[in-house]
Swiss-Prot record:
GO biological process: tRNA N1-guanine methylation
InterPro entries hit by this protein: Alpha/beta_knot_MTases, tRNA_m1G_MeTrfase_C_sf, tRNA_m1G_MeTrfase_TrmD, tRNA_m1G_MTases_N, tRNA_MeTrfase_TRMD/TRM10
GO cellular component terms, semicolon-separated: cytosol
Cytoplasm keyword on record: yes
Molecular-function GO terms, alphabetical: tRNA (guanine(37)-N1)-methyltransferase activity
Catalysed conversion reaction: guanosine(37) in tRNA + S-adenosyl-L-methionine = N(1)-methylguanosine(37) in tRNA + S-adenosyl-L-homocysteine + H(+)
Family label: Belongs to the RNA methyltransferase TrmD family.
HAMAP family assigned: TrmD
Subcellular location(s) per record: Cytoplasm
PANTHER family: TRNA (GUANINE-N(1)-)-METHYLTRANSFERASE
Protein known as: tRNA (guanine-N(1)-)-methyltransferase
Transmembrane segments: none
EC assignment: 2.1.1.228
Length: 255
């Protein structure tokens, strides 16, 4: 996958290119990241990249000419088929379904805004889609862009050490992930669930699915509203609810 970055602070993306899963992907040639700074497309002595908004008001906007020139340079480098994305609070909220959708693109150009944003006409003429990582304000689009890159790169074949990892992540099937345990078997009196030590892969799969369903019901019940549960999933969720109610009753009786 090839990803182009438009940012006033391209050095921030060393967190993606130099470390962790994405860093290994870059090193192994599975992910290619290039960046363009609008500041490199300025022609004045101060390398100005901001401008006052029409109509007044606080704050500045990114200057149109350097931004457009940077986008055009990225498009030229990408060639045909690159999707241009603007990271914006007004965009579609990124979720696992959206990540999976974006991962089908071989080329992405991510435009990171600064100041109060960018000229609406640049959005209309240069941007294919707007995406947001949540209903809150950040200082720029770099962190959302890094979030998008990290999540999308997990779908690139060969990036993860275990090919099943991406499909077993939280939200991969619309559910939260199940609890995980490693050594020691007993930690401050808390034991690993016996089923995970049993070696019975069918029962382990069933336990993990039940816990995934139950955790989603407890923490993000709205996610279940969008799912058509299979007969097995519905049965396991009912079992979890019964067990949870029994545990709560026992806890209340001890209080």
């Amino acid at each position: 996958m090839w990803i182009g970055i438009i940012s006033l602070f391209p050095e921030m993306f060393r967190a993606i290119t130099d470390y962790g899963v994405t860093g290994r992907a870059v090193k192994n040639g599975l992910l290619s990241i290039q960046s363009w700074s609008p500041r490199d497309f300025t022609y004045d002595r101060h390398r100005t990249v901001d401008d006052r908004p029409y109509g007044g008001g606080p704050g500045m906007l990114m200057m149109v000419q350097p931004l457009r020139d940077a986008i055009h340079a990225a498009k030229a480098a990408a060639g045909e088929g690159a999707k241009v994305i603007y990271l914006s609070p007004q965009g579609r909220k990124l979720d696992q379904a959206g990540v999976s959708e974006l991962a089908t693109n071989q080329k992405l150009i991510l435009v990171c805004g600064r100041y109060e944003g960018i000229d609406e006409r640049v959005i209309q003429t240069e941007i294919d889609e707007e995406w947001s990582i949540g209903d809150y304000v950040l200082s720029g689009g770099e962190l959302p862009a890094m979030t998008l890159i990290d999540s999308v790169s997990r779908f690139i074949p060969g990036v993860l050490g275990h090919e099943a990892s991406a499909t077993e992540d939280s939200f991969a099937e619309g559910l939260l992930d199940c609890p995980h345990y490693t050594r020691p078997e007993v930690l401050e009196g808390m034991e690993v669930p016996p089923v995970l030590l049993s070696g019975n892969h069918a029962e382990i799969r069933r336990w993990r699915l039940k816990q995934s369903l139950g955790r989603t019901w407890l923490r993000r019940p709205e996610l279940l509203e969008n799912l058509a549960l299979t007969e097995e999933q519905a049965r396991l969720l009912a079992e979890f609810k019964t067990e949870h109610a029994q545990q709560q009753h026992k806890h209340d009786g001890m209080a």
